[in-house]
Amino acid sequence: MIVGIGIDIIELNRIEKMLDGKLKFMERILTENERNVAKGLKGSRLTEFVAGRFAAKEAYSKAVGTGIGKEVSFLDIEVRNDDRGKPILITSTEHIVHLSISHSKEFAVAQVVLESSSR
């Protein structure tokens, strides 16, 4: 049973401006593992990576109904890729999490669907 749905869209140029010489932004948004992946990226690929993670975390927080804040922070949520490249969301939730991330020339978008783990 679906228990939550969240979606977020972000302009890539907004993330690009925040990344411009601001390591603190990445430290606030990305987990250590995500920052390690980001170190190998440059230019538009780095912007897309960070924007996709930002959107995924915002979408998750909306799906759980809290938004980013006291109950859920950016660092409580990690986005990884499985063996086939599919993004997966790692968090402490008891729900099954379905995540989709997409990019265009100007935007990154993510959708999260939370499914009850009891069937």
Swiss-Prot record:
Keywords in alphabetical order, please.
Cytoplasm, Fatty acid biosynthesis, Fatty acid metabolism, Lipid biosynthesis, Lipid metabolism, Magnesium, Metal-binding, Transferase
Q: What EC number(s) are associated with this protein in UniProt?
A: 2.7.8.7
Pfam families documented for this protein: ACPS
Q: Which InterPro entries match?
A: 4-PPantetheinyl_Trfase_dom, 4-PPantetheinyl_Trfase_dom_sf, ACPS, P-Pant_transferase_sf, Ppantetheine-prot_Trfase_dom
A GO molecular function term, named singly, is: holo-[acyl-carrier-protein] synthase activity
Name any cofactors this protein relies on. Mg(2+)
Compartmental location? Cytoplasm
| Annotated binding of Mg(2+), by residue | 8, 58
> What is the name of the protein in this document?
Holo-[acyl-carrier-protein] synthase
